[in-house]
Design a protein with these regions (language model features):
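Alpha-helical metal-binding/catalytic segments enriched in His/Glu/Asp
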Residues: 86, 111-164, 215-219, 229-250, ...
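Acidic-glycine-rich active-site phosphate/pyrophosphate-binding loop
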Residues: 95-113, 206-217, 345-349, 380
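Short glycine/proline-enriched loop/turn "hinge" motifs that connect secondary-structure elements
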Residues: 101, 144, 204-210, 279-283, ...
Length: 419
């Protein structure tokens, strides 16, 4: 039976009254103070397991590999209503050990200053894990019963990293959705999902995917003394010769990859060649690595087809350069209809909490929505942040965390049939 509008208003007020800022702040500091770079999520997982158990959730521990696990907290509904998952990654964008990142927000040590919480992971995306947990606790304290299930999944290995060759191997390189892949491959299949990536409380209805590409030139391994007049035999020289055509390809691709009025983007993320410990030798191979962003409406294979044609054209012009390529990451984009129930619900709850209409966005970054969408789990990115990261590093306003928690709590109540 549908509740009356007055009952809904009373229920909303009861739920919001149970959201406690001091608990949000305390948990935020706790999670920031636990270092959890990719591959080192174990202690963070143990913390989330204890927190879920103390909240009264049914907890599953999904071991991915030695020292890494997903933690899944389930609040089972009283019926068979719509089920909702809150999903967030525990690994952080950086390790906290980088010497060139000196801002306090790049360190796994929480600092509260001027209404902001600073610290590694608070922005991406431990703050969202806090909001999920505190939203569910508020619903429970309010005495709410739900028809559908609510799940909180704290996952490992989302950050954009991958193993490559025999040089970069190990769990610290196994990211790009490894945790959420394991999650959905092992039975966690809700009707829909809220993903609290740092969107600054905008509704991200679409985001790009990516393909990572390596293009290489080969040359001759020669002592410096014998290189006079033979500089064009160096793989670095040969890479220089093909960089201009590569950048021309990039410009064309970015135009082709336009989505929702926004052009695509390609990052030249790395160039490497030679031997820094032995520069008395010419390099036999030089590599350039590209991060090619792909709209969710375009098949990923379009990158391979286009890059292959580029390489074929380069080989015709430079037949002795030994040009080769590979694609070694492929992650699709994701989108959700503006008319989906989840989108409409978040819009309504955002309006109720903030008093202003929510805005929509299309972004060039990728998220685990790529994984869940392919498993039939409609996913919306909507989460806390307080502007882009800068020299100070990661930070989120306490007010933003509180407001996001309120929106999550009301959305779960609406979607899962609170009574």
């Amino acid at each position: 039976m549908e509740a009356s509008d007055s009952m809904k208003e009373d229920l909303a007020k009861a739920i919001l009254a149970q959201i406690r800022e001091e608990e949000i702040v305390a948990m935020s500091c706790d999670v920031v103070n636990i270092p959890s770079p990719t591959g080192e999520e174990l202690e963070m997982g143990r913390y989330m397991r204890r927190t879920f158990e103390e909240a009264g959730l049914s907890v599953s521990w999904q071991e991915i590999e030695d020292g890494r696990a997903n933690v899944v907290g389930l609040w089972e509904g009283t019926g068979n209503g719509k089920s909702l998952m809150f999903n967030g990654h525990m690994d952080t964008s950086n390790t906290g050990r980088e010497t060139f990142l000196t801002g306090l927000g790049y360190k796994p040590k929480a600092v509260i200053r001027n209404g902001m919480i600073y610290g590694l992971g608070i922005y991406n995306m431990k703050g969202a894990l806090v909001c999920y947990t505190q939203a569910v606790k508020a619903l429970m304290r309010a005495g709410v019963k739900l028809e559908g299930d609510v799940t909180i999944a704290a996952v490992a290995g989302e950050i954009e990293k991958t193993q490559w060759s025999d040089e970069f191997i190990g769990k610290e390189f196994r990211g790009y959705g490894v945790g959420t892949h394991h999650l959905v491959n092992h039975g966690v299949l809700p009707d829909m999902c809220i993903l609290g990536e740092p969107t600054d409380m905008q509704l991200v209805l679409g985001h790009y995917g990516t393909v990572w590409v390596r293009i290489s030139t080969h040359g001759h391994y020669v002592h410096t003394a014998f290189t006079r007049g033979k500089q064009d035999h160096s793989s670095i020289f040969r890479m220089k010769e093909i960089l201009a055509p590569i950048y021309e390809w990039i410009a064309a691709w970015e135009k082709k990859a336009t989505y929702d009025g926004q052009p695509g983007v390609v990052n030249v993320g790395c160039i490497r060649g030679g031997h820094p410990w032995r520069v008395s030798r010419t390099p036999d191979r030089t590599d350039v690595f590209l991060d090619v962003r792909v709209p969710p409406t375009m098949p990923l294979k379009e990158v391979r087809i286009s890059v292959k044609q580029l390489v074929l054209d380069l080989r015709k012009k430079h037949s002795d350069y030994g040009i080769e390529y590979e694609t070694f990451v492929s992650v699709p984009g994701a989108e959700i209809s503006k008319d989906h129930q989840l989108v409409k619900t978040i819009e309504s709850c955002h309006q109720r909490v903030l008093g202003t209409a929510a805005t929509h966005a299309t972004v060039l970054w990728d998220s685990d929505a790529s994984v869940m969408t392919r498993f039939g789990i409609e996913t919306l990115n909507y989460g806390p942040s307080s502007g882009p990261r800068d020299a100070e590093g990661e930070k989120v306003a306490i007010e933003t965390l509180v407001n996001t928690t309120k929106v999550y709590a009301l959305a779960a109540a609406e979607i899962c049939g609170a009574h």
